[in-house]
Amino acid sequence: MKIILWLSLFLFLVAGATPVFGVVEDLQIESVESVAEGRDFGRVGPYEKVVGRLTLSLDPETERIVDLNRAPQGSDGRVRFEADIYLLRPVHAERGRVTLFLEIPNRGGKAIVRYFNRGATRTFDPVTSESLGDGFLMEEGYTLAWIGWQFDVPDQNNLMKVDVVPATSGGRVEGLVRADHVFEEESDIFELGHVGHRAYLPTAIDDERHRLTVRSTRLGPGKLVPRESWSSRFPDEVTGEGLAVRLDGGFQKGKVYELVYASADPVVVGVGLAALRDGAAWLRDSEDSPVAVERVLAMGISQTGR
């Protein structure tokens, strides 16, 4: 089937015991509502949507998460953060499978319903009968889940995010950020936050470490673009959304442009992957879980499938 060619599908087994360094401390449910106007999905019956926020904590000495020991800690010495969670579950849990189907959100979105159910619309809130398509996953009784793990997705309704913690303890951290882009059409704007995502802000407009280069091929030699021929644009100095570079004469189609610039105050991005791991394990194992499942099946599309 063509649909399989578009997906990178994988199975993973979450460790049987609660992860040593990760704990889900709380689930704050924000809403529970019926989907598809109460449509019956065969023997399984109707589904409902659950939206909320997970509060998680980690041991700051977890070495696999870079800079976690630089994050602010609570009085008990643990690092806390929150992640979005979105569930589609059978109203009658006993009729469903004991399998949780977790999609690793690509850019905060939701796609498995559209692919597996042949949903007619692309949406971040798949609750209409049209968006749920032929209802395949529901008729099979799967509980569907999405957990936010990216910190840089745009601040839009129903995009899945994780509120990451800053690596600010012990003094300010500075370093270099690299962004590159190949333009399909000529343009005078180079957006650093791809498709509206958040980008790190530069330390200063005129920092001498900022460099823009251009090359004809991916592995070819780079040519330095004179500093006086390009400038920066800062629509939102708080979030970094809309951060861009303008180039006199514009960016050429097919060329590889690379910007390296100085920035500061990094966030601990790795907690997003911990949110996926610990959130999935908690949904499966905890007595406080809002779903009745015994195993987790996960998949990703595009970057999350790689």
For the regions a protein language model found, what residue spans apply to each?
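Positively charged n-region of N-terminal signal peptides that target proteins for export
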Residues: 1-5
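Bacterial N-terminal signal peptides
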Residues: 6-16
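Sec/Tat signal peptide C-region and signal peptidase I cleavage site
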Residues: 18-22
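C-terminal His-loop and adjacent cap/lid subdomain of alpha/beta-hydrolase
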Residues: 23-306
